[in-house]
């Protein structure tokens, strides 16, 4: 969906807009309009099994990176948005100055979810979001995902839960 892998057939639509594609020399689909693909990618945020937080950045810095550099938000706006989504995933603002290595796996995954939410996407893609967690931490991440589902957020989830 996000063209991390080249599809061989089919179509991708988001909010009624179909991604323009053509077949490449190998018979795989490729996007014909890079700007359209980039726009769609900003609306499809991914949360991975292994959090993918930058270890050299604080929680707050991890969350504001995309909104500032991709969406063009001012730092103050991005920080406000980051704090809003930290609260949404059940993390107090007291964690915003911590580095990922000082957080539990469940907290790191909730930061990853807050980071994706800070982009305010149309669709959230979750790839095994709980499989790298200790069993006692799975519930806190599932609770956040359930909350997102209850508010009507579109999510595509690959999981063994």
Question: Whereabouts are the PLM-identified features?
Answer:
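Helix-to-loop junction immediately C-terminal to a conserved catalytic motif
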Residues: 2
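Conserved ABC ATPase signature
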Residues: 99-103, 107
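H-loop/switch region of ABC-family ATPase nucleotide-binding domains
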Residues: 159-160
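Helix N-cap at the start of a conserved alpha-helix in ABC-type nucleotide-binding domains
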Residues: 135-137
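Catalytic Walker B motif of ABC-type/P-loop ATPase nucleotide-binding domains
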Residues: 124-127
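Conserved ABC ATPase "signature" region
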Residues: 17-21, 28, 75-94
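Conserved catalytic motifs of ABC-family nucleotide-binding domains
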Residues: 120
């Amino acid at each position: 969906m996000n063209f991390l892998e080249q599809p061989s057939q089919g179509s991708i639509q988001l909010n009624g807009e179909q991604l323009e594609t053509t077949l490449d020399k190998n018979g795989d689909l490729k996007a014909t309009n890079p700007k359209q693909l980039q726009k769609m990618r900003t609306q499809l945020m991914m949360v991975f099994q292994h959090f993918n937080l930058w270890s050299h950045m604080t929680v707050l810095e991890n969350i504001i990176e995309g909104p500032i550099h991709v969406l063009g938000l001012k730092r103050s706006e991005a920080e406000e948005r980051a704090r809003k989504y930290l609260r949404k995933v059940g993390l107090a603002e007291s964690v915003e100055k911590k580095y990922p290595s000082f957080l539990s796996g469940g907290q790191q995954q909730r930061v990853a979810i807050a980071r994706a939410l800070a982009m305010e996407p149309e669709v959230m893609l979750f790839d095994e979001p709980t499989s790298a967690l200790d069993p006692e931490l799975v519930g806190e991440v599932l609770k956040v995902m359930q909350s997102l589902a209850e508010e009507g957020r579109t999510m595509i989830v690959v999981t063994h839960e």
